[in-house]
Amino acid sequence: MANIKSAKKRAVQSEKRRQHNASQRSMMRTYIKKVYAAVAAGEKSAAQAAFLEMQKVVDRMASKGLIHANKAANHKSKLSAQIKKLA
């Protein structure tokens, strides 16, 4: 553990930030899983609705720097392609 006051403060802030980021990342993954589940079930309308929600969340996480912009684009591209395949 740190001895210097500023180092202790940074350690506390870092841990708080780590927990917040983990929560946000988990939430984002949950939205992505909802789209995959709807696609697997073959429900196009449900998949499209879940995709719109997921898209907002993924874009927000990319803009905040939690994930890279290319990773967000990759998620959206793969899932939209799978939704388009549904008849």
Curated annotation (Swiss-Prot):
The encoding gene: rpsT
Protein known as: Small ribosomal subunit protein bS20
Gene3D superfamilies referenced in this protein's UniProt entry, alphabetically: Ribosomal protein S20
Compositionally biased spans, kind Basic residues: 1-11
Highest rank taxon of the organism: Bacteria
Gene Ontology process terms (BP): translation
Function, in words: Binds directly to 16S ribosomal RNA.
Renumbered residue ranges of the record's region Disordered: 1-27
